[in-house]
């Protein structure tokens, strides 16, 4: 099948999935209803994934007709302990998505049944290595919420439609490891929900094109890495782009991230499972990254990719202990209370491996503002940590038209220069937003890797030049934009004016002659 045909089929599948999801929500706001659709997709996925895992083992053992979904709960119990160790959780056959779905329309206690099943799934992981990955995973799937209906009967009716709607989504054969239909559909739906939600959506979802750019910047010349980390991981889209581009096994020791919003944290963990990242290959924490980081025992990280919130408030020097925090102390100053951007930069730098790269989306103001931010920039440049600054176009993110930039950090640079790239024109217009194309991304990464000057696009600046500019790291300071105004040839213009004046004199003389003749 050609790539074009595959893409067409993928787009058709996406449209069909969105139509189902949109119809299911009814009068409920799409942003509020997303947890139900995405949660149900996850329920279907782990049911099919577990069933397939068990069936494959039985087929290999010689029982070609075995089907775990048809097994009795009593017989299945014998496998509980082993499956929890291998898969991280356990489900009885009666709890599987297909079996619950088959009777959903006539189940007067469907809400209670689903609640019990979700509790059992989470409970099965308690006391095991996977407990943290499953704990609270279904908390945002409230089967008794009035959003589903005013009465129990109405709520159960909506839940039954939800189950059957997700059942009707063509998510392929889970045995086919060449596709990632569940993960792909999940990412697509999150993108649609984020687009509809505007600003709030942008806080949990980084567009795929930007994720590709960050990952490629962070992995130039590498085919595998030790660990990947995101300090503000949202729904995990950036971390999973690393898995997609490098391959899951090429990230040898797993994916790490921290997210402050508990709903988004749950979405992230679900996203990991749907993309077939094993429970033992990811560690996502829910806490404030700046004041309560959760991965001290796992750092340093070879790849850090992040799109942290822009200019959010934080405690800063309101907490006297933070200036002594090993992440922030080296700069001798904390990021301003009203703008935590540089705190995320310092946090990422601190946890970056000596052979690693961090690619971080930044609010442009941190590149030129004075005060504490200027002092932190000076610290970064003095110690040769800034590898590149890349200016992006505006309108690349949900909910904001801000033209953001990317700061690339390294601890093991081969030179003491900073690459500045003006990629503000590298995009195409799609409806009301801009979008990076594969060609745009290729050009940015190619120049970044070659570290060469390109007129009106890139400039490799040395320490002296940056110091002369008071450690201003704005791309516009170092890359002169192309003058697109029409070029005027003054000599040619003057000649044309002289010819016009001469012609005017000739015409006046002729007019005067005509007037004289008329008067006669």
Segments predicted by a language model, with ranges:
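A structure-centric signal for secondary-structure junctions around beta-strands
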Residues: 37, 182, 225, 252, ...
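Residue-level detector of flexible, active-site-proximal loop/helix-junction positions
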Residues: 75, 235, 262, 291, ...
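Conserved S-adenosyl-L-methionine
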Residues: 200-306, 311-313, 317-322, 327-332, ...
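A conserved structural/catalytic subdomain of Rossmann-like adenosyl-cofactor enzymes
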Residues: 2-4, 8, 298-520
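Residues within well-formed alpha-helices
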Residues: 20, 184, 241, 256, ...
């Amino acid at each position: 099948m050609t790539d074009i045909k595959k893409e067409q089929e993928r787009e058709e599948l996406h449209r069909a999935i969105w139509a189902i999801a949109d119809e299911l929500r009814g009068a409920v706001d799409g942003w509020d209803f997303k947890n139900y659709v995405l949660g149900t997709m996850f329920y279907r996925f782990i049911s099919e994934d577990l069933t397939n895992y068990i069936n494959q083992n039985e087929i290999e053992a010689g029982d070609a007709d075995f089907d775990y979904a048809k097994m009795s709960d009593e017989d299945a119990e014998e496998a509980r302990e082993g499956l929890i160790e291998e898969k991280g959780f356990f489900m009885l056959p009666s709890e599987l998505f297909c079996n619950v779905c088959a009777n959903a329309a006539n189940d007067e206690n469907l809400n209670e049944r689903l609640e019990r099943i979700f509790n059992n799934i989470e409970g099965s992981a308690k006391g095991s290595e996977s407990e943290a990955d499953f704990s609270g995973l279904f908390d945002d799937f409230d089967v008794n919420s009035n959003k589903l209906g005013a009465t129990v009967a109405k709520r159960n009716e909506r839940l039954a439609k939800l189950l059957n709607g997700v059942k009707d989504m063509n998510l392929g054969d889970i045995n086919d490891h060449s596709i990632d239909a569940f993960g792909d559909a999940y990412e697509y739906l999150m993108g649609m929900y984020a687009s509809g939600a505007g600003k709030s959506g942008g806080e949990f979802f980084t567009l795929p094109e930007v994720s590709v750019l960050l990952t490629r910047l962070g992995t130039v010349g590498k085919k595998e890495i030790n660990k990947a980390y995101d300090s503000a991981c949202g729904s995990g889209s950036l971390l999973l782009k690393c898995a997609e581009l490098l391959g899951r096994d090429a990230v040898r020791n797993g994916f790490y991230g921290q997210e402050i919003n508990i709903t988004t944290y749950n979405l992230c963990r679900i996203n990991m499972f749907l993309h077939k990242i094993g429970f033992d290959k990811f560690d996502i924490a829910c806490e404030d990254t700046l004041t309560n980081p959760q991965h001290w025992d796992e750092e340093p990280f070879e790849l850090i990719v992040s799109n942290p919130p822009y200019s959010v408030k934080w405690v800063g020097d309101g907490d006297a202990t933070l200036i002594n925090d090993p992440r922030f102390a080296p700069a001798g100053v904390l990021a301003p209370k009203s703008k935590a951007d540089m705190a995320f930069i310092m946090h990422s730098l601190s946890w970056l491996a000596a052979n690693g790269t961090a690619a971080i989306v930044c609010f442009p103001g941190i590149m030129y503002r004075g005060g504490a931010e200027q002092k932190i920039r000076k610290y970064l440049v003095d110690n040769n940590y800034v590898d590149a600054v890349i200016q992006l176009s505006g309108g690349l993110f949900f909910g904001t038209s801000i033209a953001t930039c990317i700061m690339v950090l390294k601890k093991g640079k081969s030179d003491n220069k900073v690459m500045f790239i003006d990629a503000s024109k590298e995009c195409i217009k799609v409806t009301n937003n801009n979008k990076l194309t594969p060609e745009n991304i290729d050009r940015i990464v190619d120049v970044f890797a070659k570290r060469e000057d390109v007129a009106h696009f890139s400039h490799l600046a040395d320490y002296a030049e940056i110091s002369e500019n008071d450690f201003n790291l704005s791309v516009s300071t170092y890359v002169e934009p192309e003058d697109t105004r029409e070029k005027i040839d003054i000599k040619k213009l003057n000649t044309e004016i002289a010819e016009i004046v001469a012609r005017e004199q000739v015409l006046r003389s002729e007019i005067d002659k005509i007037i004289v003749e008329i008067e006669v």
